[in-house]
Design a protein with these regions (language model features):
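An N-terminal assembly and electron-transfer interface module characteristic of large anaerobic redox
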Residues: 1-594
């Protein structure tokens, strides 16, 4: 594939006769160092280093700006970083391509006014409606200092991380398998929003396509045998809550696939859904040329309830293993794949996974537990990160197995890793932390298996949700916090009050004492929908930067003010109330792909 790249534009004072010549080496070193920083620290979702393209010439005026723009046009450059140690000619040298995301790094030195060019060119970007990110070091450097200060590196990497995410999703597809689940508003896929804000094509595949491929045998039969053997060896069955129940005929007559054949059906379904999303060259060899192409997916979702799950095994295993960083073939890139085809949460899964590199965990935002309610029900008050209360995140049977927190880093900390760092021991630990409970036939008449685990780790995570609001458009919510490892007495009592066959995570947001983060209750009360996503690490700042690139306002977040990084023009919409300025700026500039 032609990867989305960061174009590095070395901009220079165009005066020949001593000025330009004296700056050539320093300017190109800035470009080379920026490219090296990006490629050594950032990876694409497939695990390969992010690629940069350095301009074929320093840019002293419009002719050279056009020459570099032509060079970039053949390289899938989706964002540009202009770098300079000196004064240059603003509108003669700036990136005027409306289709690239832009940043400018002006060197903070006294010998040459790189900061003056930075200010001048940012004014030009604002005046021309081409917002750019500003990068300017906090401390003055010597002219011969080639190091990149930490604060500058942080901004370069934050910009590049967001730009690569935007480029990665562009021209790919959200694949809806099925339609709307139980009237859930997030399941109403808004093709216009996907196209205009993300550059994503909306595609729909009826669930009957899975049955067609199972019936005819349109899947890799060798891989099916391998996957089924792996499942039987590694996916231990857990609690069956149907035992001892006297189920009515409306339920018993509805299960078409015999219980002892569930795994066979589910494994075939999983292979087929993966093939629908991504294609499979093996199908081409089998003569199924159209099916081999796939749908060019970057994210997807499965309806399930109720037209499928009322008579066929559910997709809980499929959804869980797709979103995990491994399967029967070993480590793999996680697929953002939404339960109940909640398109909005699928988009949140995609955004979170792209900036964090971790598996996206889909959750029902189920219950807020105050310390007082917890003590009343369990006899104990929570402490530690859960001392102010916690939110029960529990999906109806599926979330990425990485969310168990079973992976351990070199220091013994429980973590979620990018797939390229997953070891056999990590995979085994996640599988051992998970059992697969038979679905509750009263809710899932067709049966299936739920991925059941308890996150027994205190990990930094970020919860997010993408919503669409009439009159505003798309918005993003962000809550950084931690997972909590509650005492057994608390966990067991509360878990049994919901559904003990589902995956449970106890989430404790970081509180600020203000607004939606006044207390844990306020976070729950201001959440925009019944679903949310967690990804590993505190990546709220990266999500804010990416959202500003896509022109999506952030409705609530608890990211420290000094970490918030948006295009410089946002300051022209107000500096006292940054949230209001974000709304106005996003409305003014409109979606990225109008």
């Amino acid at each position: 594939m032609l990867y989305p790249k960061i174009g590095i534009r070395p901009v220079i004072d165009g005066r020949w006769g001593g000025v330009r010549e004296s700056l050539e080496n320093q300017t190109m070193r800035m470009a080379e160092n920026a490219a090296k920083l990006i490629s050594e620290n950032l990876k694409y979702p497939d695990g390969t280093p992010v690629q940069c393209v350095i301009g074929c010439t320093t840019i002293g005026g419009g002719v050279e700006a056009a020459r570099v723009a032509e060079q970039f046009s053949t390289q899938n450059v989706t964002a540009t970083l202009s770098v300079t140690p000196c004064w240059c000619y603003g509108t003669e040298t700036f990136d005027m391509d409306p289709n690239t995301i832009k940043a400018v790094w002006g060197f903070n030195g006294t010998e040459r006014p790189g900061a003056v060019y930075l200010a001048a060119v940012l004014a030009a970007h604002a005046q021309r409606g081409l917002p750019a990110f500003s990068i300017y070091g906090h401390d003055v450097q010597e002219a011969n200092d080639d190091t990149i200060p930490d604060d500058v590196a942080e901004k370069i990497l934050r910009f590049a991380r967001g730009a690569v995410a935007a480029g990665w999703m562009k021209n790919k597809a959200y694949v809806n398998i099925g339609a709307v689940t139980m009237g859930i508003a997030g399941s109403f896929c808004d093709a216009g929003v996907l196209q205009k804000y993300f550059g994503i094509r909306a595609e729909w595949v009826d669930e009957v396509e899975i049955l067609r491929r199972i019936s005819i045998g349109i899947y890799d039969h060798d891989e099916y045998e391998k996957a089924l053997a792996w499942v039987r060896e590694n996916c231990k069955e857990g609690f069956d809550k149907n035992l001892g129940k006297n189920l009515p005929p409306v339920i018993t007559k509805s299960k078409i696939v015999p219980a002892d054949k569930d795994w066979e059906f589910i494994v075939k379904m999983t292979l087929i859904i993966r093939d629908i999303l991504y294609g499979n060259p093996r199908l081409d060899e089998m003569g199924w040329h159209e099916e081999a192409l796939g749908r060019n997916a970057v994210v997807g979702g499965f309806q399930g309830q109720r037209q499928w799950t009322d008579w066929l095994p559910n997709a809980d295993f499929t959804e869980a293993i797709m979103a995990s960083t491994f399967d029967w073939n070993g480590p793999k890139a996680p697929t953002p794949f939404a339960t109940e085809n909640d398109t909005c949460n699928g988009i949140a899964m995609m955004l979170g996974s792209l900036v964090s590199g971790s598996a996206p965990c889909f959750h029902d935002v189920r219950t807020y537990w105050s310390p007082e309610a917890c003590e009343r029900v369990t006899g104990q008050k929570p402490d530690g990160v859960a001392a102010n209360g916690f939110i029960h995140l529990i999906n109806s049977g599926a979330t990425a197995l990485d969310g168990s927190g079973a992976c351990v880093d070199a220091k013994g900390n429980h973590v979620m890793k990018p797939f390229w760092e997953m070891t056999d021991a990590d995979i085994k630990a996640c599988l051992n932390a998970t059992d697969w409970c038979r679905a509750d036939y009263e809710y899932f008449r067709g049966g299936g298996y739920s991925s059941h685990f308890r996150c027994k780790a205190e990990m930094p995570v970020t919860m997010l949700r993408f919503n669409i609001v009439e009159g505003i458009g798309p918005v993003l919510q962000i809550a950084e916090g931690w997972t909590a490892d509650l005492p057994d007495e608390i966990h067991n009592t509360i878990d049994k009050r919901t559904d003990p066959t589902w995956p449970t995570t106890w989430f404790c947001p970081r509180l600020t004492g203000q607004g939606a983060f006044t207390d844990v209750y306020s976070v729950m009360a201001n959440w925009g929908a019944n679903h949310g996503v967690t990804v590993y690490g505190h990546v709220g700042a990266d999500l804010i930067t990416l959202a500003s690139m896509l022109r999506i306002p952030v409705t609530m977040h608890n990211v420290p003010a000094e970490k918030v990084y948006r295009p410089h023009a946002w300051a022209s919409f107000g500096t006292q109330d940054q949230q209001a300025a974000d709304y106005v700026a996003c409305k003014q500039y409109g979606p990225l792909y109008r």
